[in-house]
Amino acid sequence: MTNYFPWLTIIVLLPIFAGSLIFFLPHRGNKVIRWYTICICSLELLLTTYTFCYHFQLNDPLTQLTEDYKWINFFDFYWRLGIDGLSIGPILLTGFITTLATLAARPVTRDSRLFHFLMLAMYSGQIGSFSSRDLLLFFIMWELELIPVYLLLAMWGGKKRLYSATKFILYTAGGSIFLLIGVLGIGLYGSNEPTLNLETLSNQSYPVALEIILYIGFLIAFSVKLPIIPLHTWLPDTHGEAHYSTCMLLAGILLKMGAYGLVRINMELLPHAHSIFSPWLIIVGAIQIIYAALTSPGQRNLKKRIAYSSVSHMGFIIIGIGSITDTGLNGAILQIISHGFIGAALFFLAGTSYDRIRLVYLDEMGGMAIHLPKIFTIFSILSMASLALPGMSGFLAELIVFFGIITSHQYLLMPKILITFVMAIGMILTPIYLLSMLRQMFYGYKLFNVPNSYFLDFGPRELFVSISILLPIIAIGIYPDFVLSLSVDKVEAIISNYFYQ
């Protein structure tokens, strides 16, 4: 279905163009800029929702709302956009989290024009990379995303912000080199005219050796973003230093771009190599769940502890992608959406409680529950969501990944039992570090000894942000078909490539 009205182009370009108008707004304090940004974000979210409700057919696994504009003539480079069941979930998640992150960024007063412009530019890059149907365009959007994050880190971070920003840019730019090599290698192979169109590429077959080389290149690029150990070390530093609204975007969306690329490029375009590499992916995912869950209790810094819990949750996504079953891949997509909400909410709460008590190390905190009862309540609920309490979205996602790995015909019985056992140990270790974090922060008497200790509890703004993240978590936990019905046809189409041989 070719659409004559360029919905997706408007959705991708609106935030960055509207954001560049911020610099022309009158100097009337930060309030104008803040409200302008929030309005742009909400308008974008409404526009996206409208487009998906009225112009998107759920039961069609093909790409919809496609747009094709010639961009560079002699290189056959098109501005190609289109969405299918795989990208619609992350795009809506992006809109939701970015709107709430701009709402959460109210304490930022220094250089607030640049800050809000960077938030909007990041928004464009994220939606562009989720909806692009051209590999080079995907790469450009992937890179466009990188610069705002670096600046947000280096200008509004904590004490060691320059170190962590440099580490971040080195890791991700190093990964992007491999991504560029892979994109050019795929585009230039096997035909006189280079093509970068995802549709034509997904029907093309490559020699297995070349496919493996390309696969490794893409895998390195994506495992920096979706941190797969041993390439995860930028994540705790970056999260420990960034301002919490940046953290929400990092945990909620940036990590999901890696998972999306893994499914979109490695699984769709390179099926043979993926079936060779998937046992290794599963092993790495299981190791990662255990490793991050064991490293997390040793972190004194609150944000670093939450960052390691993110790394641990990403292990489930890797296992779901590696299991090559409908169930496993659906579980991975559900975990992508669910962790997008949970991770963002936890970082938001960590940041707001830091705004209240100005302590970042867990062993200095204690007794916060008496002064800040609302923060305590919401933090506890979200920790339960993160440790996969039944009725929350995390539980269902991990359960579906479990079923996916058990029902997989790819592997023998013994390895499957072993991997399931390791995953179960990881799920047991998760409550240990999360509950000890709650205990160190909220229980005890430490903050009693602070002179004139009167702390403001949650205001209406913080309550609004945290509850609007909490509602989708519970909704997905009770009725996961919200998310699964979007992607289930597309997932079947991807998996059917694997069993035609």
From Swiss-Prot:
The keyword Mitochondrion does not apply. GO terms for cellular component: chloroplast thylakoid membrane. It is found in: Plastid, Chloroplast thylakoid membrane. The keyword Plastid applies. Its main location: plastid. One of its GO terms (molecular function) is NADH dehydrogenase (ubiquinone) activity. It holds the Pfam family Proton_antipo_M. InterPro entries: NADH_Q_OxRdtase_chain4 (IPR022997), NADH_Q_OxRdtase_chainM/4 (IPR010227), NADH_UbQ_OxRdtase (IPR003918), ND/Mrp_TM (IPR001750). It is a multi-pass membrane protein. Keywords: Chloroplast, Membrane, NAD, NADP, Plastid, Plastoquinone, Quinone, Thylakoid, Translocase, Transmembrane, Transmembrane helix. It catalyses: a plastoquinone + NADH + (n+1) H(+)(in) = a plastoquinol + NAD(+) + n H(+)(out); a plastoquinone + NADPH + (n+1) H(+)(in) = a plastoquinol + NADP(+) + n H(+)(out). GO terms for biological process: ATP synthesis coupled electron transport; electron transport coupled proton transport. This is NAD(P)H-quinone oxidoreductase chain 4, chloroplastic. The gene is ndhD.
